[in-house]
């Protein structure tokens, strides 16, 4: 398991310095235990977001990720398993066009809310102490880079859905996460945009 420590340069090449961390994946927790761990998970993600954008040598900005989506779709390589059920029968070019229509607004938002993002903050990548239910760190940093913080938040929220035992747990987790991060007015449309983009960038 890996934990992000810092970025450094080795012979002029950017690299990550990492170390092993203890714990179990948050994906293995029950809904009740995940809810207890959730505030510390939000804090860990917030710690990544607080890193210096100027000192991060990796970037995954929206323009770059949309370019990746264009490439994936052009090769007809979108993995249908990554799509929500309602999108599985939609032509890939239509899915891409839907994202493209929102690009101007989302690019403007990114300019004012750029952070260092984990890139794939799904439940298997949060490590949690099973006794204290405190998050011990994040692993799988292959997509770490500068981006709109909502790209991370959308994935974290969506990927936790299958862990919740009831809808009220999901709503409580949503409120807790944005409270921990100090975001007073969560933008649900912005979250939805990044959920529509993400499946198009794998392939």
What are these regions (language model features)?
Residues 37-39, 43-119, 186-187:
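An alpha-helical support segment within catalytic cores of ATP-dependent transferases
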Residues 151-186, 195-203:
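Active-site activation/catalytic loop segments of kinase-like enzymes and analogous catalytic loops
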Residues 98-151:
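Active-site acidic catalytic loop and adjacent metal/ATP-binding pocket
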Residues 1-61, 111:
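ATP-binding pocket architecture of kinase catalytic cores
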Residues 21, 55, 109, 127, ...:
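Domain-wide signal for the mature, well-folded portions of proteins, strongly enriched
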């Amino acid at each position: 398991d890996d934990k992000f420590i810092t970025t450094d340069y080795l012979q002029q090449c950017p690299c990550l310095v990492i170390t092993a961390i203890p714990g179990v994946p948050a994906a293995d927790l029950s809904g009740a235990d995940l809810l207890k761990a959730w505030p510390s998970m939000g804090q860990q993600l917030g710690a990544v977001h607080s890193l210096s954008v100027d000192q991060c040598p990796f970037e995954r900005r929206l323009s770059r990720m949309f370019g990746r989506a264009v490439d994936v779709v052009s090769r007809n390589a979108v993995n249908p398993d990554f799509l929500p059920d309602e999108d599985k029968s939609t032509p890939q070019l239509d899915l891409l066009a839907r994202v493209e229509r929102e690009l101007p607004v989302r690019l403007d938002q990114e300019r004012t809310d750029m952070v260092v993002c984990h890139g794939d903050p799904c439940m298997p990548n949060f490590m949690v102490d099973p006794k204290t239910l405190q998050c011990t760190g994040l692993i799988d940093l292959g997509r770490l880079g500068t981006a709109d913080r909502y790209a991370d938040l959308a994935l974290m929220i969506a990927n936790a859905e299958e862990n919740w035992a009831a809808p009220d747990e999901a709503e409580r987790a949503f409120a807790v996460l944005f409270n921990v991060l100090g975001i007073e007015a969560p933008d649900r449309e912005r979250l939805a945009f990044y959920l529509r983009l993400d499946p198009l960038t794998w392939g």
